């Protein structure tokens, strides 16, 4: 990947001037100027996903300049470098090949001259066999009973992705009950263990190194709980599986290495649900549906790699995001799925985006001080958010671009629930774009029989300025295939932005310092002696904790 400061490109400088030219033009005026705006500013994927980006503060010149920016930042070359297994994660000297995990075409993908696809396919075959045995009931626990509950123990990418997907695809779940434990707070594992029976529970310990503090602390507690009932360490093999690469530590734990599912250092944690880390997904929805999840992502990979920039959905979304955060001053993006099954979608991409692009050092090692990198990502399902934080989006002083996501078809046809849900989905983007003028507010009052003199003091509070940017993503139905495509779409959006930001999107050194300090503090919490080895605030907090515990 080349080292190109985006602010030094011709396109960036042109965009700065273009922003000034467009500053006084509202979204409403853009619609008036362009009668075919919806058709001209929307894209479809596989006739199952519609992305409408017409309600943004952009015109064709904006898009043209943004595409020029992508070209000047060598986006196409960077994309090919990723798909071809080059070590684009330079700070860790690793390839970035989550796309190989869902390479349904099975075309060779090389890392260091070796085709990785045979190993990928071998792990998938092993996962399929394991899933069939557990789901069918052939896999028995230590008392001869079939498995009824699966507990996934992981954190970060080993938890957020599998949990998000199993929740999103609950309509496809089988009889197995899934549980996810991530927090090192003992409450998380304790409350989970209250719900399950050691005779019929399977634990998946998801840790590449098998040394992750939070995961192994929870796994050891689960092991103790299990052995208190089983009274035989040899039975661990029937109730624990490992998603790891550390054979020695897995064996030491007592897990049969036949029940160890491998993945590779070219799989980043936040991109790992497509790997063995997705075993909990496959157990929950069946392996055929897991393959459909991979297939949807693979189709989006092909679209991203081959579609012209003008028709390329991930590139378009990424470029609009860069426009919003670097030229319009937005600092956050809200992800608002109008589907209760997608209630963890925003949390998943909060990690995906912020851990990838939350960087202040560019690819040359220089501090970035003249442009913004990754935005803050947040969100909740609609319509809940409407009764919580939409007030600020509509009438606050900050620009908050929003992605509204909804399925046209529901899995639960219940009275007119879905029409009411979707009426809100459509209404919100219309309200955010077009608002309500003073004249419209006054007209409403007059229609209600009020005089303008009576209401003049309340009118300003009921005005909506509009001109708030949104994308509308309408999915025909949330299926394993469309969910896979949606996830891959956002993954590639993040990649594109990282390329243009001139940062390394696939490391996460920002999580390390806190871990190091926690390891230093942990032994200090054991005794009762006063601590004075830190700053006065940290010393004071530790000592108060010791006196209160």
Curated annotation (Swiss-Prot):
Family affiliation: Belongs to the GPI family.
Claim: Isomerase is one of the keywords in the record: yes
PANTHER family recorded: GLUCOSE-6-PHOSPHATE ISOMERASE
Protein name, UniProt field: Glucose-6-phosphate isomerase
UniProt xrefs under HAMAP family: G6P_isomerase
Pathway: Carbohydrate biosynthesis; gluconeogenesis; Carbohydrate degradation; glycolysis; D-glyceraldehyde 3-phosphate and glycerone phosphate from D-glucose: step 2/4
Function: Catalyzes the reversible isomerization of glucose-6-phosphate to fructose-6-phosphate.
Keywords, comma-separated and alphabetical: Cytoplasm, Gluconeogenesis, Glycolysis, Isomerase
EC id: 5.3.1.9
